Regions:
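Short beta-strand micro-motifs enriched in acidic
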Residues: 29-33, 155
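C-terminal catalytic domains of large/alpha subunits in multi-subunit enzymes
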Residues: 1-10, 55-281, 285
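Accessory "access/gating" subregions that flank catalytic or transport cores
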Residues: 1-29
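Short, aliphatic-rich beta-strand segments
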Residues: 35-40, 161-163
């Protein structure tokens, strides 16, 4: 119908990479309640890692969900699994958990959880990569990459973002609904980066604006439609083929929006937030 359309593509590594040790660790303990308790020092900060690890255990042991308990990470009993960054936890800790499941499954042969009370099953995985500049054939900077294409559709009459479409190659979607949520959340975050948010600082990197003046994106500014497309593609031979989908969801959004505005008025916008958009012209919502 003649509405301006912008498109952008991105790629993003999963894991720390570049030769830095990148460990995932997990301990499965059959406790007195005759259930398998999952312990890992990987912080679950909203990305759904706990759900993923439970699914990994159920899938790889055949145990019922009711027999699995995810324990929040702690430094007392949970093995260190690195920080929650770099879109790494589903991959590295997911694989560590899968390896622990192999040991648990072997012990369960001909037995029940009642027979295994008090036993621990440990798994770890090191995502091996090469340092930058390594003099080796075919150096590996990261163990996996995610890919994405996002599209922005503007309403030609109002200049508002009408729809966002985000297609992401996630390898294997352990939890498809969670993947969609990650995509939608990342798009909304980047809509803020693109259209409204600023974080001004002085020459000493001290913030110069109050929190309420940062232009944080609000719920009533979200576009009418965000379409998340989860693309599954085999290839990775660890963690069931899952590739992290955290940070990449926020990368191509702003460029896609900038491209759409360029097609609307021919102006290239090269700084964030984008200048002379609907959020600048009017006080109404950006979406």
């Amino acid at each position: 119908n003649g509405d301006p359309v912008g498109i952008a593509c991105a790629m993003k590594n999963a894991g720390v990479g570049v030769g830095i040790p990148d460990w995932g660790r997990c301990k499965l303990i059959v406790e007195a309640d005759e259930k398998v308790h999952i312990y890992s020092g990987a912080s679950c900060i909203g990305q759904g890692l706990g759900t993923v690890l439970v699914q990994v255990v159920v899938t790889n042991t055949g145990l019922h969900r009711d027999n699995i308990v995810y324990e929040r990470s702690n430094t007392w009993i949970a093995p260190d699994s690195g920080d929650t960054s770099g879109s790494r936890q589903t991959l590295v800790t997911g694989e560590a958990t899968r390896r622990a499941c192999e040991k648990l499954s072997a012990a369960l042969a001909g037995k029940t959880l009642h027979d295994l009370v008090g036993q621990e099953f440990y798994g770890e995985y090191l995502a091996k990569t090469d340092p930058l500049g390594a003099d080796v054939p075919n150096p590996v900077s990261h163990v996996a990459y995610g890919y994405a294409t996002q599209m922005c559709i503007l309403d030609r009459e109002t200049g508002r973002v009408k729809k966002m479409v985000a297609a992401h190659d996630v390898g294997k979607a352990v939890n498809p609904l969670s993947c969609e949520g990650q995509i939608e959340g990342g798009v909304v975050m980047s809509l803020g980066y693109a259209l409204t948010e600023q974080y001004p600082i002085d020459e000493n990197c001290k913030p110069t604006a109050k929190y309420g003046m940062l232009g944080l994106f609000r719920a009533n500014q979200i576009p009418p439609e965000i379409q998340a497309i989860v693309v599954e593609k085999p290839g990775l031979n660890v963690a069931g083929g899952a590739i992290g989908i955290g940070e990449i969801t926020s990368i191509p959004t702003a460029p896609a929006i900038a491209d759409a505005y360029f097609r609307l008025d021919g102006q290239r916008r090269l700084t964030l937030p984008l200048e002379n958009t609907i959020s600048d012209r009017k006080s109404g919502s950006a979406g």
